UniProtKB/Swiss-Prot annotation:
Cross-referenced Pfam families: PGK
Pathway connected to this protein: Carbohydrate degradation; glycolysis; pyruvate from D-glyceraldehyde 3-phosphate: step 2/5
UniProt keyword list: ATP-binding, Cytoplasm, Glycolysis, Kinase, Nucleotide-binding, Transferase
Protein name: Phosphoglycerate kinase
One BP annotation, GO: glycolytic process
Subunit structure: Monomer.
Sequence similarity: Belongs to the phosphoglycerate kinase family.
Record-listed E.C. numbers: 2.7.2.3
UniProt xrefs under InterPro entries: Phosphoglycerate_kinase (IPR001576), Phosphoglycerate_kinase_CS (IPR015911), Phosphoglycerate_kinase_N (IPR015824), Phosphoglycerate_kinase_sf (IPR036043)
Annotated source species: Roseobacter denitrificans (strain ATCC 33942 / OCh 114) (Erythrobacter sp. (strain OCh 114))
Superkingdom field: Bacteria
Amino acid sequence: MSWKTLDDMDVAGKRVLLRVDINVPVEEGQVTDRTRIDRIIPTLQDILAKGGTPIMLAHFGRPKGKVVPEMSLRVTLPALEAALGRKVTFIEEPNAERLSDLPEGIVVLLENTRFAVGEEANDPEMARFLATLGDVFCNDAFSAAHRAHASTTGVAHLLPSCAGRLMQAELSALEAALSTPQRPVGAVVGGAKVSTKIALLENLVARLDVLVIGGGMANTFLAAQGAKLGASLMEPDYMETARTIMQSAERAGCKLLLPVDGVVAREFKAGADFEVVALGKDTVLAEDQMVLDAGPQSVAAVMAAFRTLKTLIWNGPLGAFEITPFNQATNATALEAARLTKSGALISVAGGGDTVAALNQAGAAADFTYISTAGGAFLEWMEGKTLPGVAALQG
């Protein structure tokens, strides 16, 4: 796949309409996690260094085409200015005339694109309006690339377009992990439900050498083999799907790793009493028992598998990582992946949902090769889908 980057564009003296994702968590009017803001700073600095004027487009929350004051992007200004080290000009009601003669070195943030009813509908009229506000379009919001919206896709077809530095890094990392990986390649797919990751699992078993399944999802796979897992989180309606995925993995030569032991408790709370129980097709738990984490034998098997790999993709935790003592499997395996990455033995790419939080909690995130801040876009890429925001940049 080929796409243009800022290296391919002459932005000197031009207004660069820059789509970013600064949909950050806010409490009591304060940004509580600046990660997404920090990640767009290299693109802003690059545009400024090349003599361009960045005009940021972004969404915030889900106002559904209405002006909702508490979803104004104004709340992000202090964090943006602190990260960038310069003033950012906020414009609530932009128009072409107002943005036609901006002073050199100015950085502009426009109001929430989703206040406009045409944004999520990818309305051609809104796309044409946005195109009047800039000379070049730069998309740095991979995390919104799975949405065909006016500010991600529509405007990209109307202006010379390229990927920003964050988008470029995301695409390069994901292509290296899935499209052209160093083999053997494996993945960890965890989390609560099989139902949300069917397409992902179906796509991965055809591409991987090793697939580790963990979290509540693993319970459904074990139940599909005959295990009786008491009050454990599982999806009986998806047991047949689990069997199909296991058969597909076998046909494709993909080694499927399910837990062989589990941390079992009768209460889902911090510090709950627990025991380690062997897991397999003949396992029978009491009606009030729950599998809440993978056990030590499972952890050892996963870590041994990691040591055979050259590329690892990680999506989802191996247990109820939010609560001690059910975070042990996620923490131990994440730290092993981080160690292997740091030693140069492994390329590791992670993203989606709870994954970033789990790896941060484990203290492993800093040593992974790449961690994607994207949720849905990361998953859809891993499912093999074409992302509209990326497709619009090709050529």
